A protein has these predicted regions:
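Beta-strand-centric surfaces of beta-sandwich/beta-rich domains
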Residues: 32-400
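Bacterial N-terminal signal peptides
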Residues: 12-28
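Initiator methionine at the very start of the polypeptide chain
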Residues: 1-2, 31-32
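Bacterial N-terminal signal peptides that target proteins for export
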Residues: 2-16
Length: 400
């Protein structure tokens, strides 16, 4: 009996050793990238190998197929390449006719869009170029936003944006780094609502890979009220049903009263909140991670800034302060602090200034917004996009 116990103990120890070896080997294989899907890329995991496949859609490869780029014999660069021929920048861009929709790219399979670059012409009509994204064959887009507002540059004029999620670079280069996973398909379109043709250079960089069930779908929605329908109150987002997380806000704000305009609080109504929200800010500039009116105490002017997570990237005109008619572009990305919800979400912001006697003033400003969030599908219906006249940016008129 003692010998049997001794042998059994040896077998048990041997089994544990083998099990540990198998575990360590599996862990090592995983560390080498065998279990990595190529998503969630950052500086720390760049050395990790994966089975993901990199693809790219552009006017030089409309399908993104392997080995099919740079083959065009017709395109916007044909005349410039007439002495060089195929392979020499024959199709670097597309012309999108007035009042038409162009499919920028269609992807089949599972994966994620990881970066988008585009540059339009003309720049001052970008509020009339509508971006739409569709996931997994849906007929109602998950993204429907004017191009300029999607890239946090909504006043039809160039503004440098130096953020993690969006970059706007010289001279009119719009870049997006929001991860956009899909499981069956993805489609990206551009509608030209202008009465003139537009030129678009673009590239959609994506990966084909497995997408875990824990990943939700990217959404973005545009709204505008001019003037505000409810004095002093603007709704950034409502009607969201499902589970997800709110990840960003862009506001294009035109002031219609003199003085400081940003005392209003942003409020997040989460999972059934009615009269009172779960999250309430302390002021507009506070939400955008500034303070005390964004004022530079030396110049006595608004101080623009653009950082990885937040910015006041546009002040028009830049050399005035507290004037009626001034315009502002502000962004706030919740990359490290997403606002999570399990059932529903509503987001509002107050338009609040000052009047005599140290009293708050409910403003009647012109506010346009883009809300960015991830959620499970299906998503709720979006509000109807404003008409062309409501999308246009009128001339800047500042009152002294």
């Amino acid at each position: 009996m003692k010998r049997y116990v001794r042998v059994s103990s040896q077998v048990c120890a041997w089994s544990l050793a083998v099990g540990a070896l198998i575990f360590l080997t599996a862990a090592d294989l995983f560390a080498q990238g065998r279990g990595f899907n190529g998503l969630d890329m950052d500086l720390a995991n760049l050395p990790r190998l994966s089975n993901a496949q990199t693809r790219s859609i552009s006017p030089e490869n409309f399908t993104g197929e392997k080995g099919k780029a740079g083959m065009a014999t017709e395109g916007t660069g044909k005349n410039a390449a007439r002495d060089l021929g195929q392979g020499w920048k024959i199709s670097p861009s597309v012309r999108i006719p007035a009042k038409s929709t162009f499919t920028m790219g269609e992807i089949n399979g599972s994966g994620a869009i990881q970066q988008i670059w585009m540059t339009p012409a003309p720049l001052d009509k970008t509020q009339l170029y509508i971006l739409r994204f569709y996931w997994d064959g849906e007929t109602s887009p998950s993204v429907e936003v004017p191009m300029s507002h999607f890239f946090a540059c909504g006043w039809g004029k160039y503004a440098q944006i130096n953020s993690l999620a969006v970059c706007v670079n010289p001279g009119s280069a719009f870049n997006c780094y929001w991860p956009m996973p899909f499981r069956k398909s993805a489609k990206v379109t551009m509608e030209n609502l202008d009465d003139k043709d537009m030129t678009l250079y673009y590239q959609i960089n994506y990966t084909l890979t497995d997408v875990p069930q824990s990943m939700a779908y990217f959404h973005a929605q545009y709204r505008r009220e001019s003037p505000l329908k409810t004095k002093g109150l603007y709704t950034i987002l409502d009607g969201v049903q499902g589970r997800g997380q709110f990840v960003g806000t862009y506001l294009a704000w035109e002031v219609h009263s003199p003085g400081w305009w940003g005392e209003g609080e942003i409020k997040f109504y989460i999972d059934g909140d009615k009269e009172f929200p779960t999250i309430c800010g302390t002021g507009t500039e506070d939400y955008f991670c500034g303070s005390y009116n964004f004022e530079n105490h030396e110049t006595k002017k608004y101080q623009t800034f653009s950082t990885p997570y937040t910015g006041l990237a546009q002040v028009l005109p830049p050399d005035e302060i507290y004037k009626v008619g001034q315009r502002f572009g502000l962004y706030r990305w919740h990359i490290t602090d997403p606002v999570r919800f399990d059932k529903d979400l509503r987001v509002t912001i107050q338009a609040l200034g000052w009047q005599s006697g140290g009293r708050y003033l409910q403003e009647e400003d012109d506010i346009a917004s883009t809300a960015y969030w991830y959620q499970t599908e299906p998503h709720g219906a979006f509000p109807k996009l404003p008409g062309v006249d409501a999308l246009k940016v009128g001339p800047l008129q500042v009152q002294n």
